[in-house]
Amino acid sequence: MLKELDPYTVFFNEQDVIKFRINNTGEYTGIGAMIGRKDGNIILREIFKDYAADKAGLKAGDIITQVEDIVLKDYKEDVSNLLKGGKDKKIDIKFLRQGKDQTAQISLNEVDIKAVPYFQLIGKDVGYIVLQTFSTKTTQETKAAILDLKAQGATKLILDLRSNPGGLLTEAVNICNLFVPKNEVIVTTKSKIERHNSTYKTRFDPLDLEIPLTILINERSASASEIVAGGLQDLDRAVVIGNKSFGKGLVQRPVDLPYGTQVKITISRYYTPSGRCIQALDYTKKDASGKAQKTESRQEFLTKAGRKVFDGGGIEPDIAIDEAKMSALAKALNANDAIFNFSTKLYYDNQKAESYQVTDKDFLSFKDFIKSTDYKIETAAEKQLLKFMEVAKEENIDEYVNKDYETLLANIKNNTQAQLEKNKNEIKKLINEELIKRYKYKDGFFAYQVENQIEIKKCIEVLNNPALIKKTLSK
């Protein structure tokens, strides 16, 4: 039945409902780690500093094999539920680290996931704020960060929404309200059912109407992040910098079902103040395999000051940073965990160091690592070629093109080492960013970003150029 709806419609069992509430509040009792599943393995992706997993000596890259008496190899349920419970509850686990069996006892404690995990004064007057989710605490934490930074001397702000997947709509509106007057329309929702049509306006007096503001977005900024970026862009209140956002502009509502379960269904779409639709996928247009296609239209709209902006799925930045886009090869290396696993190996090779900077020698080792391990690197070109062959088979012409297909596929695969070399700097950067979290946790990662990322440097450059801000935000 769910397949007849859009891909974002999902059934929540009782545990999923609890997890959804945790995402909205940012609070739970657990081990304090990000957990992922890959090829049947339960992997610790990131350890949160000073929480239970960290205190028990667990590290990113550890593979959990058993929780109490439950062996996880064939465990199909959500493993995170086994790692939650009452405060101070003790859990015995077994795990693999670099191929060796180990054990640990974890004493659960309360985990507080910050909506604003990091903020910093850059130089003498630029405030930098990372906003990673839109939970019930987002506006409160953002406001506190702004006031703290202003007390330190900040007269300009960077709001970093990169890779923020969204969250509560009301919090997105309230974040905008920090910078725009009361009664401004931030977002409207439109549905085929009239009662689901809504207009969301700012309701409070603003915190600061004048402070120069830049907003950072990327292709993983979605939903509530896009409402903030699109709303402040349409109101000419902030310069949006980075790369085009994800394009998730669907309003979803949880509907209660029996036995504590829910189904989250799509009821309407988001529209920015200028009238732009954020949604990228058009479910009325599907390809041969039944997948929804990205909208191709680029309709023109006007901001409050009369600037031209466009819809077509996602928010386009005022200032694009093409060099910040991840290459197809880098995406493939992230997807197959090559970057993550090599970083784990490199960390243990240099575990006694307080920090580590990836060298050219390490990059050569990475190339050898790719050669010696069975990593499937499926680039965009290879995916398109595979799609072509699927169509050829459907049309019964595959036998006529198979030889050329095999030649092209072999050429793409044989070109991997050359592509690695071409993307050397990007790959080294990704390994560095993964490594820094092993040594310095998330705080160290954010500090590293401030010092090294071109996106943040571009924001500072724009903020230090009032004439450029005026020109960008004017008709």
Regions found by a protein language model. Give the residues of each.
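Sec-exported extracytoplasmic/periplasmic mature domains
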Residues: 2-10, 66-69, 84, 88, ...
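Polar, glycine-rich mid-to-C-terminal structural blocks
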Residues: 224, 236, 243, 247-307, ...
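Extended, small/polar residue-biased N-terminal targeting/export presequences
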Residues: 1-43, 88-116, 450-460, 468-475
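Short, conserved catalytic or interaction motifs in soluble domains
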Residues: 33, 49, 69
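Short alpha-helix capping/helix-loop boundary micro-motifs
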Residues: 49-52, 295
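Cleft-lining beta-strand/loop regions that shape enzyme active-site pockets
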Residues: 43-46, 54-59, 65-71, 76-258
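Conserved functional hotspot residues or short segments at active or partner-binding sites
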Residues: 277-284, 288-475
